[in-house]
Amino acid sequence: MELWYTEKQTEHFGITAKIKRTLHTEKTDFQQLDVIETEEFGNMLVLDGMVMTTEKDEFVYHEMVAHVPLFTHPNPKHVLVVGGGDGGVIREVLKHPSVEKATLVEIDGKVIEYSKKYLPSIATALNDPRVDVQVDDGFLHIAKAESAYDVIMVDSTEPVGPAVKLFEKGFYQGIAKALKEDGIFVAQTDNPWFHGELIRKVYADVQEIFPITRLYTANIPTYPSGLWTFTIGSKTYDPLHVEPSRFYDIETKYFTKDLHKAAFALPRFVDDLIK
């Protein structure tokens, strides 16, 4: 008998993967958590029925969340990751030699626990001495912080359940306060095919708070539609105008210095969302 997992991405569309077995399933205090072993994409983390990451394509998302802001900022020392309990963004953050401390604030400790167990290649950096892992509410953490971080990365789930408030204007205002005077933040902002209005709203909210606001994209096969967006807000530095000398060699599979700029070249229908 064949086993297949389907993520219903809209009322009329979804993606399906053939699975070998279910590795773990649990209703945590915050969400339904499943880890499944798939034929095509390796181990897959699923939260509330939505694919969060897979062993095969995880590097695209994690590299694009981390390296775009970290190459934009000339000297990022203190970095905060909100969400991201799988550890992939933290792994990429630590590739930058200027980073002295990376704080991870994940609301659901079970995500951290089972990522370490079933996604070790992604969670590999969570025990690094430069990393401060806190099982806490990222929204509350931001509210208490002031001029504390050079770069903040919001690696949230979709805007449902505990992540809803991470897409609100008040949260972005809190981020601006938590950043240093030349700080940068980035957030994943879903896909333009099914959630164009969300992108439009988030971009407008961020633009009211940060003098430099940009949208960029990446191609992630297991995410809805495959085309994913990220919104970056900066107090000082423009990600479109990074001096070539600021780029240095790090080990990546997707990100390059040329792709850094190219990612901001938007399809017209996406660009129209933010005009």
UniProtKB/Swiss-Prot annotation:
SUPFAM superfamilies: S-adenosyl-L-methionine-dependent methyltransferases. The keyword Cytoplasm applies. It catalyses: S-adenosyl 3-(methylsulfanyl)propylamine + putrescine = S-methyl-5'-thioadenosine + spermidine + H(+). One of its GO terms (molecular function) is spermidine synthase activity. The keyword Transferase applies. Residues 2-235 form the PABS domain. It comes from the Bacteria. Homodimer or homotetramer. This is Polyamine aminopropyltransferase. It comes from Halalkalibacterium halodurans (strain ATCC BAA-125 / DSM 18197 / FERM 7344 / JCM 9153 / C-125) (Bacillus halodurans). The lineage of its organism: Bacteria, Bacillati, Bacillota, Bacilli, Bacillales. The gene is speE.
